[in-house]
């Protein structure tokens, strides 16, 4: 009999749980940590908080889930028209445009632009357009009520006969994504907790306290810190897109810390135990989502843990923390020299930070320098690798800046 690490009840029906959730394209799994009931409950409550958070990243890189396909991610053309990014990075339109014109012989012509394979939406928009322009149809001697089924039938026949033109947009595509926030803390803590017990059930920690925080989200905010160091927490031999998890004990500082970096762009540190006196622990795991291959990383964790709050806690800004942040920005600016990122996204991103004058001043200094590094917006004809790398660096910056603006619930 196995014992569930959440409800502590014994079970014999094996349940395959993703330590890194399937919604994140995770591949690390276990069959002896959770009972079926807890596995299902956590999936519908805690893992559910990740829905939609990283869909744009997954779709742009065409990453595979073991179960299901990532839904389209919302975006916009530069003209403002809505579109979606499909799995694999392909953009499709989301709306229907109908233009009406008349020729010298007083014949009405409709020019319709619509997303492929969205017949219900197309028919609905045709009906709406004709009803809204019924006076114009009646002036041309057309009964608008009969016009609706006739137009729908005519469009349907053209589609069946392939008498339509297919085209890709030449407009740059614009999207916004926000990484971070307290919604990530519960699923990340669940990942670290399961990862620890998957490898070391002998480690003595307050399991009930961690389980309560995962289940309720209470008193979890001060456990987490966004890692804005210029150097990565996990080092790899190959360039890739990695999920990484690590755990390390700091016996001198009496701390047990967990480290998570999702997609190589959302690095977090969490305090599993603030008064740890158990055995030494050092665990690490990495998975390259581009090569679909597990790879053991070299860990680059902080050498000390006693100052972890002073160094990374941006809930209260100090001159020292601002210096660390400036160092990270300067490092990222070197990366931006080589890639294009959408200018409007950066303009939207660099919002005023009102609760600390020193931070606001730094933003005003940073914005012109960033804009000098920005070239034209990326359109959908750029090579996917280049577009992906630019997007990757933009996400790092976005998550880093969001650390200033996070506030407790």
What are these regions (language model features)?
Residues 9-28:
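Histidine-centered nuclease catalytic patch
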């Amino acid at each position: 009999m196995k014992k569930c690490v959440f409800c502590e009840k014994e079970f014999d029906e094996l349940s395959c749980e993703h330590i890194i959730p399937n919604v994140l394209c995770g591949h690390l799994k276990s069959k002896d940590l959770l009972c079926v009931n807890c596995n299902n409950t956590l999936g519908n409550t805690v893992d559910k908080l990740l829905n939609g958070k990283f869909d744009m990243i997954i779709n742009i890189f065409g990453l595979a889930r073991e179960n299901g396909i990532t839904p389209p991610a919302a975006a916009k053309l530069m003209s403002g028209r809505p579109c979606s990014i499909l799995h694999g990075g392909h953009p499709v339109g989301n709306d229907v445009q109908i233009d009406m014109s008349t020729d010298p012989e007083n014949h009405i012509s409709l020019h319709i632009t619509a997303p492929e394979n969205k017949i219900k939406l197309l028919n609905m928009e045709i009906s709406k357009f004709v009803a809204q322009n019924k006076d114009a149809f009646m002036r041309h001697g057309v009964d608008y009520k009969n016009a609706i089924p006739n137009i729908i039938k005519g469009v349907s026949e053209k589609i069946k006969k392939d008498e339509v033109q297919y085209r890709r947009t030449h407009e740059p595509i614009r999207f916004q994504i926000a990484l971070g926030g307290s919604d990530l803390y519960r699923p990340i803590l669940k990942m670290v907790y399961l990862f620890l017990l998957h490898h070391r059930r002998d480690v003595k920690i307050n399991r009930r306290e961690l389980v309560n925080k995962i289940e309720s989200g209470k008193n979890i905010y001060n456990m987490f810190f966004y890692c804005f160091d210029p150097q990565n927490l996990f080092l790899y031999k190959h360039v890739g897109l990695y999920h990484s998890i690590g755990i390390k004990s700091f016996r001198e500082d009496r701390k047990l810390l967990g480290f998570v970096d999702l997609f190589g762009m959302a690095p977090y540190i969490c305090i599993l135990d603030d008064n740890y006196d158990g055995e030494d622990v050092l665990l690490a795991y990495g998975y390259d989502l581009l090569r679909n291959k597990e790879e053991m990383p070299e860990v680059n964790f902080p050498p000390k843990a006693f100052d972890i709050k002073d160094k990374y806690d941006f809930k209260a800004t100090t001159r020292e923390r601002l210096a660390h942040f400036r160092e990270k920005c300067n490092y990222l600016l070197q990366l931006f020299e080589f890639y294009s990122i959408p200018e409007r996204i950066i303009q939207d991103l660099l919002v005023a930070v009102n609760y600390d004058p020193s931070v606001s001043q730094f933003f005003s200094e940073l914005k012109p320098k960033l804009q000098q590094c920005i070239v034209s917006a990326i359109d959908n004809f750029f090579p996917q690798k280049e577009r992906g790398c630019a997007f990757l660096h933009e996400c790092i910056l976005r998550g880093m800046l969001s650390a200033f603006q996070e506030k407790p619930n």
